[in-house]
């Protein structure tokens, strides 16, 4: 998606081969574009934002428990459990949105794949929730389900009537992620941003600000 125009065709499949075969971030982006039937050379100099629908980090408390054997003082309810949920996820819980946990829910495999992609192709933390290759690629975490009440997202989606023809919910979520990436690049003020209290390495789930009460 560039300047609000969708260039890529819908695609749903396993990215294991592009991830394993890519030699660097430029090659990885080119392989992603190719599976979506976009000529990589046509956008060779364009900035790239990947909005990835999976947890891109584990909580600091969980990492400290595993690596250092350091426990938190107490564990209360599930939604406030710092081992299960990061600051960004607890932020959403407090606002009526229920994200999944990379630890207790069935998304751990996808989370490790997303973290693996960051480590290989966008290993530098530019700011909380923003990973980059120090070049044209930046990656952020998206959560399409959190966008359902956003009038900003609804307005953008109406510009793509083909969304109703997409065969699978994953493809519709992919379009929502692409629109989130567009907002991040062109209209970051429309997204809820992390505060100074957000742990840098835990990342941040970017959602439209008007999706939150």
Residue ranges and their predicted role:
Residues 1-213:
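RNase H-like (RuvC/DEDD) metal-dependent nuclease/polynucleotide-processing core
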């Amino acid at each position: 998606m560039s300047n609000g125009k969708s260039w890529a065709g819908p695609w749903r499949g396993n990215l294991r081969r592009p991830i394993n075969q890519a030699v660097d971030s430029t090659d990885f982006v080119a392989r992603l574009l190719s599976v979506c039937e976009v000529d990589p050379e046509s956008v060779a100099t364009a900035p790239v934002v990947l909005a990835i629908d999976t947890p891109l980090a584990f909580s600091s408390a969980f990492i400290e428990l595993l690596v250092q054997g350091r426990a938190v003082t107490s564990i209360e309810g599930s939604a406030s459990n710092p081992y299960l949920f990061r600051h960004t996820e607890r932020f959403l819980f407090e606002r009526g949105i229920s994200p999944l946990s990379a630890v207790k829910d069935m998304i751990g495999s996808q989370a490790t794949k997303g973290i693996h992609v960051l480590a290989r192709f966008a290993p530098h933390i530019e700011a909380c929730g923003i990973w980059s290759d120090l070049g044209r690629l930046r990656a952020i975490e998206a959560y399409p389900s959190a966008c359902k009440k956003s009038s900003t997202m609804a307005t953008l989606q109406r510009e793509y009537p083909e969304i109703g023809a997409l065969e699978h919910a994953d493809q519709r979520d992919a379009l929502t992620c692409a629109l989130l990436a567009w907002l991040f690049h062109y209209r970051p003020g429309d997204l809820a941003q992390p505060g100074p209290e957000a742990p840098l390495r835990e990342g941040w789930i970017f959602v439209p600000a008007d999706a939150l009460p």
